[in-house]
Amino acid sequence: MADLQEQVQNLNINDDDKNASSYVPPHLRNQRRGPPRHDSPSDGSENNNDFGFGFNNRRGGYNGGSGYRGGNNSYNRRGNYQGGQNNSNNNNNGGGFNRIPGRGSWTNGKHVPGAKNQNLEVQLFGTPEDPQFQSSGINFDNYDDIPVDASGTDVPEAITEFTSPPLDALLLENIILARFTKPTPVQKYSVPIVSRGRDLMACAQTGSGKTGGFLFPVLSESFKNGPSPMPESARKSFVKKAYPTALVLAPTRELATQIYDEAKKFTYRSWVRPTVVYGGSDIGSQIRDLSRGCDLLVATPGRLSDLLERGRVSLANVKYLVLDEADRMLDMGFEPQIRQIVDGCDMPPVGERQTLMFSATFPDDIQHLARDFLSDYIFLSVGKVGSTSENITQRILYVEDMDKKSTLLDLLSASNDGLTLIFVETKRMADELTDFLIMQDFRATAIHGDRTQSERERALAAFKNGNANLLVATAVAARGLDIPNVTHVVNYDLPSDIDDYVHRIGRTGRAGNTGVATAFFNRGNRNIVKGMYELLAEANQEIPPFLNDVMRESGRGGRTSGFSSRNNSNRDYRRSGSNNGGSWGNSRSNSNSGAGGWGSSRSGGAGGAGGAGGAGGAGGSSWGRSGSSGWGNSSSSNAGAGSNAKSSWW
């Protein structure tokens, strides 16, 4: 009794004993208790911007303003950079992406690679036995005989192997992990060109390693030089923005995703955080990805324009602009968006950024327009640009429309077990043909514009891993997709443009390997018969007699639908005397065929027709505003020697 009375007397309603029990609501009783709140910074930034994820939250650490869930945009004050997160403290690691496996940092002006993570390496690079991770099936030795021509002033000498220098040591490790043994021709030149700070226009045949051609030099220089300082305006902004250092524009979501997947490999353990944005997917989740940090942004023009209008992306810090499949983006009507992105936003102007344009074809009119984007650039032509590879065996079969399905069944039954890509012209036909093949017990799937992004991704994944060995596709997959081990391409429906045919069959025979391309031809395809005839002859392929018959029936072989404009697409238009530019500098060419070597060429180029309509009179073709496509016709004459008229995108 005395003990109880003593305990009552000792009670204190202000007792602050931390060990005393307290009431916990039922819905919180099973949750793990977090660390105590602090009013001072923990292991993160001591002076973080108040406008991070936690508004007016000045705490660092995991949930603070500079931790994994915090951070303002992509910058620090050059003391510590964590791959896209803000951290203002010059002395501390401050959380950030060092909490993520395989993520490095930029600390005190130095690149600090992250620790190796074996599980992540397997996810990114696979194993040598995995057919999905075999350097996209690259046969590097077959590249040795491909001729290369580089023209421009002070063309740097090509590299012959991957070494450090000129490549960053961490990038070199990732290249080795990806099992790239030697640079492809386009990579041999792009690495020294970009490291010299030069602009580049590269024309290379499909499957020649163009993605590595721009990722390797851009990432190498980024690893060495670190992030750009944060603009003063970003420190005062209430809206979280991404400030990428490198911007890659691609025409389709599939190509953008493919570039992003490659970027993830080669940014492994680095401070660079890649992000991808494209239409047809939830923009909210993409904005959240951007808010976590973005140093290399891969985007389609339409979605990027949307994000710029929303104020979620700033291009003020872009050092490197890459246009992949540039001609296709213009053909698809993206010219107004590209023009607005490059010239109408806060991107640094020509001369203050490096611009790289990559594609398999660059017709003369595209080259002329490149003058608006490039400064003192080097023109790189690899192989027979704008044509097909001799590694692809082309077979042209005369098949009427009513006989196509039965002919396809015979073709597939006689083929090997490799992956076959079948191109059709319409979405309806893609679904119809896929259903037909499944009913015939073939493992088929399809991609086209009406399928959701997740459906397209699942279809591509099934095709790549072999669960479906037949992929029926519309033109959405014709450009840029790098699917390893495609042994056969079937043009069930031929396109109306010979350039599209070139890019379709380029899905096989990639990167020095061999492949087969079969086309179903009939008189409904007479508009490309001349272009196809010349293409087969150029690639030393067998020309079926019926092509000659159809050419004779159509007089001159019909309209070539763009083939004639491609004939000189592997030449630098600045060498022509009909274009402005005055005297020309040196050019380098390299061929292992025996007679090739280094040399120089000079050609006069004073004066010339300056108008976009060319040297013709009234009715000359030109670029102009025409609805949303960006194409138009000019009826005015811009001819005349020394004309000061300038081609315009508008």
UniProtKB/Swiss-Prot annotation:
Any GO MF annotation of the entry: G-quadruplex RNA binding
- Alphabetical keyword list: ATP-binding, Cytoplasm, Helicase, Hydrolase, Initiation factor, Nucleotide-binding, Protein biosynthesis, RNA-binding
Task: Supply the InterPro entries for this chain.
Answer: DEAD/DEAH_box_helicase_dom (IPR011545), Helicase_ATP-bd (IPR014001), Helicase_C-like (IPR001650), P-loop_NTPase (IPR027417), RNA-helicase_DEAD-box_CS (IPR000629), RNA_helicase_DEAD_Q_motif (IPR014014)
What are the Polar residues biased-composition ranges?
A: 1-13
Asked if Cytoplasm is a keyword of the record, the answer is yes
Where composition is biased (Low complexity), the residues are: 44-60, 71-104, 631-650
Subcellular location as annotated = Cytoplasm
Q: Where is this motif: Q motif?
A: 160-188
* SMART domains linked to this entry: DEXDc, HELICc
Please give the residue ranges the record annotates as the region Disordered.
Answer: 1-114, 549-650
Q: Which Gene3D superfamilies match?
A: P-loop containing nucleotide triphosphate hydrolases
Q: What range(s) does the Helicase C-terminal domain occupy?
A: 391-551
Q: Which residues bind ATP?
A: 204-211
Q: What is its EC number?
A: 3.6.4.13
- Catalytically driven reaction(s): ATP + H2O = ADP + phosphate + H(+)
Q: Which GO terms describe its biological process?
A: cytoplasmic translational initiation; negative regulation of cytoplasmic translational initiation in response to stress; positive regulation of formation of translation preinitiation complex; regulatory ncRNA-mediated gene silencing; spliceosomal complex disassembly
Sorted alphabetically, which PANTHER family does this protein's record hold? Answer: ATP-DEPENDENT RNA HELICASE DBP3 (PTHR47958)
Q: What is known of its domains?
A: The Q motif is unique to and characteristic of the DEAD box family of RNA helicases and controls ATP binding and hydrolysis.
What the protein does comes down to: ATP-binding RNA helicase involved in translation initiation. Remodels RNA in response to ADP and ATP concentrations by facilitating disruption, but also formation of RNA duplexes.
Q: Which family does it belong to?
A: Belongs to the DEAD box helicase family. DDX3/DED1 subfamily.
- Under which name does UniProt file this protein? ATP-dependent RNA helicase DED1
